[in-house]
Amino acid sequence: MRCPFCGNIDTQVKDSRPAEDHVSIRRRRFCPACGGRFTTYERVQLRDLVVIKSSGKREDFDRTKLERSIRIAMQKRPIEPERIDQMISGIVRRLESLGDTDIPSKVIGEIVMESLARIDTVAYVRFASVYKNFQAADDFDKFVSELRPSAPAEE
């Protein structure tokens, strides 16, 4: 593993243990050249996924990009980081288990929205505002009104 501080390719693993999400290995590394210490994570990847964008463009699935968009939606919400990590790992496992390596971005967005809706409504609305490309306050109002249970009809 290359040292992120000095570029040395000869680093040493000082400690390995399961990460908090229990689906990856956390490794503490040391660079003998500069004395730098850093952490890496190792995860199992069942298959190489390709995202099919709405434009038809294809790009490799990037777990980091998925994680970043979810963390932005969850920003300043009272959700434990471990729960977010578990949710992300669950989404990736679900994508890998779909049986196809080519996955439309729409499918990924829908799976993320399902997961967010179960955990935090505010994060769900935040993510939806970007995913569904809200342009005005009316878009938010319509979306949120669909979330609210309808009042029982008077007889």
Curated annotation (Swiss-Prot):
InterPro entries: ATP-cone_dom, NrdR-like_N, RNR_NrdR-like. Binds 1 zinc ion. A zinc finger (unnamed) spans 3-34. It holds the Pfam family ATP-cone. The keyword 4Fe-4S does not apply. Its cofactor is Zn(2+). GO terms for biological process: negative regulation of DNA-templated transcription. Residues 49-139 form the ATP-cone domain. It comes from the Bacteria. GO terms for molecular function: ATP binding; DNA binding; zinc ion binding. Keywords: ATP-binding, DNA-binding, Metal-binding, Nucleotide-binding, Repressor, Transcription, Transcription regulation, Zinc, Zinc-finger. Belongs to the NrdR family. Negatively regulates transcription of bacterial ribonucleotide reductase nrd genes and operons by binding to NrdR-boxes. This is Transcriptional repressor NrdR. It comes from Cereibacter sphaeroides (strain ATCC 17023 / DSM 158 / JCM 6121 / CCUG 31486 / LMG 2827 / NBRC 12203 / NCIMB 8253 / ATH 2.4.1.). The lineage of its organism: Bacteria, Pseudomonadati, Pseudomonadota, Alphaproteobacteria, Rhodobacterales.
